[in-house]
Amino acid sequence: MKLSIQKTPEANTIFFVWLNQYSGILLKTPSKTLAIDPVDLKAKNLTNLDAILITHEHYDHLDPQLVSEIQKLTNCSVLADSASTKKLRNAVPSGKLQEIKPGMQTQIGGVRVKAEKSNHPAQAPVTYIITSEDCVKVYHTSDSLPFPELALMGEKEQFDLVFCTVGIAPGASPESGYEIARLTKPSLAVPYHTGTVQSQNMFAELLKNNLPKTACLIPQQTKIYQVSKRQQN
């Protein structure tokens, strides 16, 4: 199944696809296409890719052989945390591989990618703030648990979309996912990194009852979704 998004988003919008039951996301802005933590898919199903972003070295986030195959097919850049960068040194050309740490940011054309910390038991995990050309702000939290700095980050960034882990990872639950949404206060929260719809529904119920200003979208894998920039007050 081809997972590429053929249509180009209009100004002030982005498209995304949930690629697997983990934190695999395909994100398309008006000019760039990014894949975050791609695993459990075939390289030939991802085309026209500008960059791969890796959050950490665990099997459900990094498949070095798959990253190598995708990179060869698309000639995309690869951004990765320190531990994943080591695993990718022999898989990706040095000119296409960039190590990234919390606090660092880079540009992929008009798209800005900033790495932030992650509360997860990996060697040097990161989360990513992705800002489109039109300043649509997406926060990919990998499978991080909540951490206090999220509140200030949410206030500063005014996120349009935050992905919230609700299962599978150590300590992760609908409640911990809700806490990420509560701290960051995005316009839209998407529960992911789970093998059950029940956990996503529990997250949605918590959001509805306690954070009514944040909408919830429960994604289906491989389906394309559109997200628009929040309205300024």
Segments the model singles out, each with a brief description of its role:
Residues 1-47, 99-157, 172, 219-233:
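Core dinuclear metal-dependent hydrolase active-site scaffold
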Residues 23, 59, 84-85, 104:
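Alpha-helix capping/helix-boundary segments
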Residues 33-34, 51, 161, 188:
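Short, Asp-centered acidic motifs that coordinate Mg2+ and/or phosphate
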Residues 58, 84, 119, 145, ...:
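Catalytic metal-binding/acid-base residues of hydrolase active sites
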Residues 65-70, 91, 149-153, 176-180:
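A short acidic, amphipathic alpha-helical/loop segment
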Residues 75-76, 158-163, 168, 174-194:
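Proline-aspartate-enriched helix->loop->beta-strand connector
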Residues 92-108, 153, 178, 182-233:
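Binuclear metal-ion centers of metallo-dependent hydrolases, dominated by the metallo-beta-lactamase
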